[in-house]
């Protein structure tokens, strides 16, 4: 039971209205939808809103290529987006567009408040200009080499490789992505938001608990570099909102995009009499506001957005939750390079509930990347959902219908039910803190208990014995009651399955009625709830996205693993045999890298702090040539935990991390599978 009802507004980042939704996008919407559904299941007032991000030069140029207006294009894309989301059972309370009257009014109002408060500056800048297309080039239409890490083929506003943000004029060897011409410099007057004026407030805010610690650490690095004024204007031609009192100047898309959260909610409030916009957005609001975003847009949501709100006298979000990227079969997805599986391609071949569960089973509260391994995906769904969950009902429901008039018995032994109910607050807390993977493991552990109970009781044998009918009735009724509790726990993740189970059990699944007594309750005839994933369905998705997957796998070293394995054995033969007793002396443990840092004057070593779930060890690892320290923090690895400390000039090294590879850039630390915890022994 919930102690008091909370008022919650939750958002996902706005999908850009110039292309289809892919499975990388779906991670965020599934994550947010699960969290939102959980809050509603617990009885809270929760509103999940979103919108299409519908402004910018990319949309303007693509519409020109299609021979239609930008308005026509974004309307078409929005229809496709909404259908994809609906088919994935994403339950928005409102889905709107940033190209709306609500958003125009709000963006103008916020801008004018910032201007009147002295936070908008104007200055003449030199900007890249396409001499062939006669237009200033927006950030995303200039590509070149990152001025920070020197990675090539990066956009003009931020680097996908190192996460740095910069001005397009800082880009090395820039080229126009519109015409391929080398841009020239041209003067123009632009409007800037005085972000440095909010540095003190932002430093306090990011340490207030509103952000994940990983995000706060990254933002501190940006503070060290110094905050800069933010260019919020673009020159015509541009598809967006014209800036008040500035003909020919338009708001940069990243100014009105986050305001789109407010615009969508305002649209919802205008359609409902029971919702008040100011109850959620006024400075003294006690409602909770949460933004779920990808790690690539942390800078905008954790610096620009709260500073804009502060300057305009509007409340800031309660928390901003970032997640990592999705990879497919171990390889990075890239929308710009076309290496993605479209949501529609998936939906044409598989049940959306499968992906919802798989993502949930791998999600946590950190900013880890999530790998969609298609083989593991099929195995996990078939094992957990079909083999454990649905199987529990399919093995017992038929006996209730055929032998006991479809009515459940009074269960006299409540010991298993008590175990299941005792986990309710544990599972609820895991949902609340976005530790979905841990929640799924708790639920599946209960499913294992229930299936073991049915297997041991063997109702299919009991029903054959006249003197065992009551016992068979008890076992099947108990199993279905446990099944009901399991599906209730999974309702935020598997809403369609839960809906079908509600029809079968002829009751509504709510958190508050987990302990409901079903004695004498009549159920409907059981029908198959879920089918196994067949290899041909996975193959169909691969075939439909073949070009994308092949492009992705081009960068994946493991596609050449068989050849590499042979070559590596020739280069580095297997060592002489050792006894089992010798091997048993080595204590291998799972460790989380809690800190990683460079060592001054050390060419090969990084200093790692390894968390063993109760103890911390310092290790100097010779992996500097292959890893940047910031890429290691938070990762799980395997270490030799009982190696005698080795004194080095930098300090004592108290173990060794395991890595493979010949050296240099070709070093790969070992990472355990999802579910391993710091301190676990590797056997």
From Swiss-Prot:
Requisite cofactors: Zn(2+)
Subcellular location, principal: cytoplasm
EC number: 6.1.1.10
Binding-site list for ATP: 335
Enzyme class: ligase
Catalysed reaction equations from the record: tRNA(Met) + L-methionine + ATP = L-methionyl-tRNA(Met) + AMP + diphosphate
GO molecular function: ATP binding; metal ion binding; methionine-tRNA ligase activity; tRNA binding
Alphabetic keyword roster: Aminoacyl-tRNA synthetase, ATP-binding, Cytoplasm, Ligase, Metal-binding, Nucleotide-binding, Protein biosynthesis, RNA-binding, tRNA-binding, Zinc
One term under GO cellular component: cytosol
CC cofactor note: Binds 1 zinc ion per subunit.
Residue numbers binding Zn(2+): 146, 149, 159, 162
Domain tRNA-binding: 582-683
Subcellular location: Cytoplasm
Pfam family, one: tRNA_bind
Motif 'KMSKS' region per UniProt: ranges: 332-336
UniProt function note: Is required not only for elongation of protein synthesis but also for the initiation of all mRNA translation through initiator tRNA(fMet) aminoacylation.
NCBIfam families reported for this sequence: metG (TIGR00398), metG_C_term (TIGR00399), PRK00133.1 (NF001100)
Assembly with partners or alone: Homodimer.
Protein family according to the UniProt entry: Belongs to the class-I aminoacyl-tRNA synthetase family. MetG type 1 subfamily.
Official protein name in the record: Methionine--tRNA ligase
Organism: Shewanella frigidimarina (strain NCIMB 400)
